[in-house]
């Protein structure tokens, strides 16, 4: 019996080791090693389904003054991403109180109208969309799904290993494991991914013909809007000081890709008034 328990405890860990061996990927531009075991086709199908659900619930605007700049800039960024198997899609959600944007797997992007005042112009919009396309290009959703799977497998192994403990002890240890996994594994990965999306986005906007310095200006505007930030170690995003330092450090690299495009003229975005009650979530995901 003791031998069986030992084997049971080892199996989940062995499974993770196997996954690590076969699930290695490399993020574009940053060359960061990634643990991804979720197939890209599955990740994309989930993204497409989720995107349709979101668009079905939200108020989508077809007003060209909002849609045209998003799609024009978005397609330039998508072309720079050089991912032709993605069916890139850019839509605008009519919600002036939400200053946000999001990316789902497969190249499905949405921007809330509340982001327009902070983006300010097409260069600022390029910084936002570069960030979102960066998430999609680096398969961050698939990476998070793979990471969650690994945590579940390790949690299963821990619960098997606690078989001889009292129920109270098992419960306390499993709760501590859950908190430790979130603070020690899941959230730091999210910060890593957010920083990586900034890095990749900076390069993409430069390749698309937009001055990457506009990204630094964008995050300074966000910082002014959100004067209070959660402590960085409990945040899923880098704080603004860290973000600005990172971007400043990456600018020389991004400028190596930048070639001013005479076909691009930076245009002011339509004014809709300042974002309102949802400022706490006002930051591209």
Predicted regions and their residues:
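A Zn2+-metalloprotease active-site environment signal
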Residues: 6, 11-12, 24-285
């Amino acid at each position: 019996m003791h031998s069986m328990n030992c084997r049971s405890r080892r199996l989940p860990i062995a499974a993770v080791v196997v996954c690590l061996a076969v699930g290695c990927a490399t993020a574009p531009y940053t060359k960061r090693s990634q643990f991804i075991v979720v197939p890209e086709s599955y990740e994309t199908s989930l993204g497409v389904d989720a995107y349709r659900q979101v668009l079905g619930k939200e108020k989508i605007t077809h007003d060209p003054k909002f849609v045209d700049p998003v799609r024009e800039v978005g397609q330039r960024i998508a072309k720079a991403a050089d991912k032709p198997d993605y069916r890139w899609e850019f839509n605008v959600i009519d919600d002036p109180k939400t200053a946000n944007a999001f990316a789902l797997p497969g190249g499905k992007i949405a921007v809330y109208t509340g982001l327009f005042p902070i983006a300010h112009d097409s260069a600022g919009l390029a910084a936002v969309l570069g960030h979102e396309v960066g998430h999609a290009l680096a398969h961050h959703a698939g990476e998070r799904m793979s990471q969650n799977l690994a945590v579940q497998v390790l949690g299963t192994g821990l619960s098997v290993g606690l078989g001889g403990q009292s129920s109270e002890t098992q419960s306390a240890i499993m709760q501590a494991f859950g908190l430790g996994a979130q603070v020690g594994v899941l959230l730091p990965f999210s910060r890593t991914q957010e920083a990586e999306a900034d890095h990749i986005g900076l390069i993409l906007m430069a390749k698309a013909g937009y001055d990457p310095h506009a990204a630094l200006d964008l995050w300074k505007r966000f910082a002014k809007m959100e004067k209070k930030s959660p402590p960085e170690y409990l945040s899923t995003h880098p704080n603004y000081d860290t973000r600005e330092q990172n971007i400043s450090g990456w600018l020389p690299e991004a400028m190596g890709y930048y070639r001013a495009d005479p076909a691009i003229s930076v245009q002011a975005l339509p004014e809709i008034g300042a974002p309102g009650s949802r400022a706490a979530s006002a930051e591209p995901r």
